[in-house]
Design a protein with these regions (language model features):
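Divalent-metal coordination cores built from histidine and acidic residues
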Residues: 1-93, 128-130, 135-155, 159
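Structured core elements
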Residues: 5, 59, 98, 117-119
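Generic beta-sheet signal
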Residues: 7, 100, 120-121, 142
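Residues within well-ordered alpha-helices
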Residues: 46, 86, 106, 128, ...
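N-terminal active-site wall of soluble small-molecule enzyme domains
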Residues: 79-85, 90, 98-111
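His/Asp/Glu-enriched, well-ordered alpha-helical/loop segment
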Residues: 92, 96, 156-171
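Structural recognition of alpha->loop->beta junctions
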Residues: 108-128
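A post-motif C-terminal structural segment
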Residues: 115-117, 135, 139, 164-168
Length: 171
């Protein structure tokens, strides 16, 4: 049968790609269990409940995203110190780390922090590919998103972001 490596929700910064706490009061209030974490101590505290509840992979948002309203696509969100703390805590428990990352700066920071895989890699350069190979970091391209996203039904800002990044993800 299939081998499953379940992850919980993504861990990200306040106001970042993973932050859905502002949509409905009382749902996913900010705290370690929400996955919203700022600073080294909060990042470590956010990893632990996920492991407690059976996550075999910790997913973090190292950069801003395409289908969220915060920041330009690919802008680095976590600091190098925060990423390193998240990776160290997960690895201490034998759990892998996957990083959502579109932009080169955030991808490099995540790779240098020791993440096991980078999801998307839409705006990747040759030097960072070399670094990923040297570090043994898996690249998980999501080039299918160009076919899966209905651009006509996106809000204008998200449509512009998607129209800009999706063709670059295939290069």
């Amino acid at each position: 049968g299939p081998r499953m490596f379940p992850a919980g929700h993504a861990i990200g910064i306040t106001g970042g790609h993973a932050d859905t706490t502002g949509y409905v009061p009382g749902v996913l209030e900010r705290g370690p269990e929400s996955g919203i974490a700022d600073g080294v101590d909060e990042v470590i505290a956010a990893v632990r409940p996920q492991i407690k509840h059976g996550a075999k992979v910790i997913k973090t948002c190292a950069t801003a995203g395409v289908l969220s309203f915060e920041g330009p696509v690919g802008a680095q969100q976590y600091s190098e110190e925060e990423l390193a703390a998240l990776v160290a805590e997960a690895h201490r428990h034998g759990v892998k780390v996957a990083a959502h990352a579109h932009g080169t700066q955030g991808i490099r920071a995540a790779v240098l922090a020791g993440v096991d895989s980078i999801e998307h890699c839409s705006l990747l350069d040759a030097d960072t590919i070399t670094l990923m190979k040297q570090r043994g970091t898996w690249l998980v391209p999501t080039t299918y998103l160009g076919e899966a996203i209905d651009l006509d039904n996106l809000p204008p800002l998200l449509r512009r972001k998607a129209e800009w990044v999706l063709p670059r993800a295939r290069e």
